[in-house]
Amino acid sequence: MTFEEKIEYYRTIIDDVSYPTVNKWKAEHPNKKVVGMFPVYTPYELPHAAGMLPIGVLGAGGKIEIDHADSRIQSFVCSIARSTLELGLTERLKNFDAMYFTSICDVARNLSGIWQTNFPQQLVEYIHFPQNMNNTSAPKHYRAELQKLVSNLEQLSGKKITNEDLLQSIKTFNRNRELCLELYQIKSATPHLLSTFEAYILLRLGTLLPVEEHSKLLEEIIPQIHQRNRTPRDFVRVMIEGSFCEQPPLELMQVIEDAGCYIVDDDLLLHTRWFNEPVPLNGDPLHSLAESYINRSRYSSVRHYGNKSRKEQFLEKIKSGKVDGVLFCAPKFCEPALLDYVVLKDELEKQNIAYMTFEYEEKMGVFESIRMQVETFVESVLFFS
């Protein structure tokens, strides 16, 4: 298949909310477990080390109607929480044995409790990330949290998780993150060779496959990207900010790119490249994961920082990406993204950097208004910056 044909095929997989890859894996490994991982970041290495399949659960992307979830969760929260719960209530996640949620926002916190109530047969973990990164006890605190997860996975699987298992999983995911970062390097240096629409499909596919299979796929497809014969265009280099949890419709990314933008950086699917450097493979593996979360994590609105403010990290991203403008693209009702917007847009105004903002939701189907806004934004950057 050509690169374009592969992208079309992979899109059919990520659009299928029945999780066909999970069902196939479960049929082939009936005695093994599947763990659902809610965004933004969860330690995929732990269930992998237990011989389980960690799978990203990122909502339904507008592919299903919300018929049951609104009786159990507020209707005025983000789409991803409601549609994820709907996936569970309609038994589309029946082959999942556990779910991981994290302390990223009030909605995610509440969703973990709602999940425990409605799915008592599943192991439900609520992960507490450290909040004060300057505290010397932070690595110890988070390592204890990881140890608790390991102990519960051992009970679920009936398998002892050794340090060797953990180190091998860290090594495996280090390689996958390296390949995902390579996609982003291509997207930034030569955006005409790889659109964000295409890169997103390749990364999203990885949330539905065993990590080894995804890494092999990327190793085969990256050379194809370099060989594409595509002419650079006079597009504006933009960065998307605010889409770190609920996933924007793929059509929205197409509209932005068709309007004259190269999306050279974004915060989509951050877990695929969460660490700026490989997690160390020497010493205690749980300490390495904990220490890496504190010292090697990528900038995100859902993570607290120690020595650098969010404004500093944000401006560093703009500078390194040679960005002409920023698109604040946030889900409706997403408090972390919308609260950060106020602070970050003030900083952009001080730095005289162009920006625009709009909101989206999973079931969004009309994009003409956003297309016109982005086209106007592109013209203002090209002719008046």
For each predicted feature, which ranges?
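Acidic/His-rich segments in extracytoplasmic proteins that coordinate ligands and/or metal ions
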Residues: 83-155
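Acidic/glycine-enriched edge-of-secondary-structure segments
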Residues: 2-6, 62-80, 98, 203-212, ...
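An N-terminal, globular interaction/scaffold subdomain
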Residues: 38-89, 97, 112
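Peripheral docking tails and interdomain loops at the edges
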Residues: 6, 342-385
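Redox- and metal-dependent alpha/beta enzyme cores, enriched for Fe-S-associated oxidoreductases
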Residues: 29, 40-41, 46-58, 243-306, ...
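A charged, amphipathic alpha-helical module
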Residues: 1-33, 143, 147, 151-278, ...
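A short, acidic, amphipathic alpha-helical segment used as a generic capping/interface helix at domain edges
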Residues: 88, 305-322, 339-340
